[in-house]
Amino acid sequence: MMLKMGAMFVLLLLFILPSSQQEGDVQARKTHLKSGFYGTLAMSTRGCSGTCRRHRDGKCRGTCECSGYSYCRCGDAHHFYRGCTCTC
């Protein structure tokens, strides 16, 4: 009798653990997508132009102008593109 109850308990655990792990994976995926979206949103280059470039000291400098945005800066580009860019 105790052996049957022990076997039932093990089977129950085998079904519960994978389903809870899948729920955690879904939540992690949602968080990753949300952070990627806001990172791209903050790095808008629409309407930006200027003379932003990397100097010999490795820092990005130059003038930037953005149409429709109150703040514009020259800085390192997104990690997909190595270089400098104007961002609003």
From Swiss-Prot:
Keyword Secreted: yes
Modifications made to the protein after synthesis: Contains 5 disulfide bonds.
Proregion residues excised on maturation: 22-46
GO MF terms held by the record: toxin activity
Subcellular location: Secreted
Keyword terms of this UniProt record: Disulfide bond, Neurotoxin, Secreted, Signal, Toxin
Family label: Belongs to the conotoxin S superfamily.
Domain notes: The cysteine framework is VIII (C-C-C-C-C-C-C-C-C-C).
Protein name, entry field: Conotoxin Ca8.3
Source organism of this protein record: Conus caracteristicus (Characteristic cone)
